[in-house]
Amino acid sequence: MANPVGGMKHTLQAKDRNNAKVIVADPNFTKTAAHADLYLRQRSGTDIALVYGLIHIILKNGWEDKEFIENRTYGIDEIRKEAEHWTPEVTSDVTGVPVDKLLKAADILAHTKPGTVVWALGITQHSVGTSNTRILPILQLILGNMGKAGGGCNIIRGHDNVQGSTDMCNLSDSLPMYYGLTDAAWKYYCKGWGVDYDEFIKRFAVSTKEPKQGGTPVKNTVFEEYYYHDPKHPEDRNWRNEKGWSLSKWWQGVLKEENTFSSGALRVLWVQGTGLTSMAHLAKIQEAASKLDMIVVAEPFVNEISILSDRKDGVYILPVATAFENEGHLSATNRSGQWRTKVVDPLYESKGDHEVMFLFAKKFGFYDEYVKGMKMGIVDREIKQVKDDFVWPDDATNEIARIGNSIGYGGRTAEMFRRHQANWDKFDPDTLIGIGGEVKGEYYGKPWPAWDEKHPGTPILYDMSKPYAEGGSGFRNRFGLEHNGVSQLASEETTLVGSAIKGGYPQITKENIEKVLGITLTEEEKAKMGPSWSMDYSGIIFEKCREKGVVPYGNARARAIVWEFLDPIPKHREPVHSPRWDLVQKYPTFDDQARNFRVSTKFKSEQQAKDWSKEFPIVFSTQRVVNLSGAGMIERTSKYLSAITPEMFANVNPELALKYGIKDRDMMWIHSPQGTKIKVRCYHSQMVTPDRICMPYNFAGIMQGVDLSARYPEGTKPYVIGESYNTVTNYGFDPVTQISEFNAGLCRIEKAEENTFKTSFFHEYGERDAMGKE
């Protein structure tokens, strides 16, 4: 596990109640590591090598779950071949983890079951972040820990409803519920929204010029399947099928320093619910902010994007209500939902997020279409408008449930969430099962998939030991029926308890339902049924599956090979800026990416430009601070939370700091290969080794040594300001998600003079400066 602040309570409870063994793998010795039975300190950016080293030991000793692998997985043989290279000695050289600790970790994992793997941003924020998030589930598949209580993979979020916002796909590459951007997905949504598809798509521009490379359309990753309306006729490409700009590189849509592919330059930035200073490459964001036509910030507190540039106009700050002034449902990392009741109405001039968007839609003339989906319902197995007005947030919640078949939101209605909230005392805290009254037999918050209102929810994904009616399921059939002549369906020995179908079977569609389920549909059912379980508003497919005890998405094998990706199996690749030039030659990064999220991205050309470690010899990464979230703009406006962390700092090993003449609590400069720098307080700390430093990412208000606090609107300056780590984030992005490489960069440090301005605040103990002196 990494350093999941949100999971600390559960970790300690597991140790106390179940004598759970805790292994912490983290470049920094965290508070979680202090409670570990075994601590592995790997070099930043070597997680894949570390896990392959563990897999090597497990397979060599025959500790893998052979039956699970045989019946429920595909491609583990390829993992086995790759793991052969990662002997304990090779793994130790690359990661820095001693051989004896590798052997001990593998032994604990193999002989202490079930076991779960927990991670947070330390895994995702790398140029190999996607591969990182694949290798850990592969480890769990090899150990047979998937689909079991106490097993699986658990991603700990930094605050509430991250899972909910993920389900809503607040991204530029998919419609909500992971439907993607295909025409079929747009048609499905238009039907659910009650709007005409042919009229709707006229809102999108059609490009007649297609960038080409070597005479063929540019295509790098699986997600670029959305690039073309028709791959054979790229001149007919439609922007509705294109990914937009990513949060990591949106600024290139303004600056256009790299090759960009868009119908026009970005001119307006609307920021709502996002601490933009928690994004990488803040100097680029600052430059882009000064060139935009307009910036709109809809936040409860002043988002620091508002003060980054010195522009005197074109910035609009809309006061938006806090969580305590809003109502609706949220989703946790275990996929359970929970109703949040409004404490007070929005104060002063603030409005709820939805009110802001409603006003925006009215101003631009599409309000009626915007809210029509909340007026829809299912009548006689067909979706149609059933009311003239809507009730917020209940009808919005029900709209999500009605449309969200792809992950099984059908049973997650507003009525259900309110009912569960009123019966908190009737749920078992360990199993989540309702033990009495009107919630008996339902799991708390109906963790998705909850296929319809009769389904109890799914507390543990892929658990074959429970029947459909109790939340059981196999692995989803999503990637075809066979690959290279090998069936992608589960073996005949892998049958869901109570299922009418023995062994594996494909996802249920209109075309195959009669054959797979052994039923005969009426002509009326055929006419009203959607093309597949994920696009069926009628509910007929779910109903027929329920009768047979069959999960509608199929019963397949978990694939270790993603044949559409640049790396079909995860492979160790050195960070774009690596401290090991020798390993860069053995484990280079990806080739440069001609196009992803509307912009080209450097990989190998940046990594191979020179040995970056000669000028920037120190590895740096981020750390999470318990009392600060995201950009920290909420907590830094609280006097008491600010008192806990009154200044921006970097943890530096005393040996490293003194090498540069930097004493404990001195100010220091941190320089990046991008030519940027930040000025922060040096904290001598043993949590890091002499070759690396780490620091939080939750500050703003100072930019490369310059105090920006005078730019805050009167009365809105936080109690604490400071440099943002993200000013010195190294160049590096994941080729699939384009997430930035926050956690494996290089830097150099030097001593700095004290600030001539204050970064601290007043509290009841008197005024303190940044040194903490009275």
Q: For the regions a protein language model found, what residue spans apply to each?
A:
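Long, contiguous, secondary-structure-rich segments that constitute the structural scaffold
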Residues: 355-414, 500, 510-526, 532-537, ...
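Cofactor-pocket helix-loop regions in the catalytic cores of large enzyme subunits
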Residues: 1-171, 180, 189-461, 465-470, ...
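Mature-region segments of soluble proteins
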Residues: 451, 471, 628-629, 708-709
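Non-catalytic terminal/interface segments that mediate subunit docking, oligomerization
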Residues: 139, 241, 573-575, 579-642
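Hydrophobic transmembrane helix segments
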Residues: 184-186
